[in-house]
Amino acid sequence: MSAFTLKISDGLVRRIEAHGVETFPYECCGALLGHDDDSGREVTELFALSNHRDDSPRNRFEITPEDVLLAERTAREKKMDLIGWYHSHPNAPARPSEFDREHAWPWYSYIIVSIRDGDPKEITSWRLQDDRSAYDPEGIESVAARTGI
């Protein structure tokens, strides 16, 4: 059992999968907005971003510093937290790569969706250890979608 759990609605999971299908065979990426408090960490909104990786978008993604600031500002304006990031792995497992680890930050949740031949197959979530040496798996708990946000 994972030490961490990320709550997210089935509808938001489907939207991450749809974003991965839409950009296939290239990686998609986006921000996870929500809340991290005593009741746990919950994604309540997605913020789709463009993959700015020009040299290898089929197996790499890049989120610009400007997009990070935009995601942070959007979260703040909506009285939410920026709690993580998502991206797809076209025709690859939903496991973080060494490249993912080298470019990730501790604390955040990282959702990865595997898209095989244009179809979503697996979705996982991870948290980078504080020393950045490895990821810990993060459980995904399905919750009802919030309304009125």
Spell out what each predicted region is.
Residues 1-82, 90-149:
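Conserved beta-strand-loop surface patch within small alpha/beta domains used
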Residues 85:
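Conserved, mostly hydrophobic/aromatic
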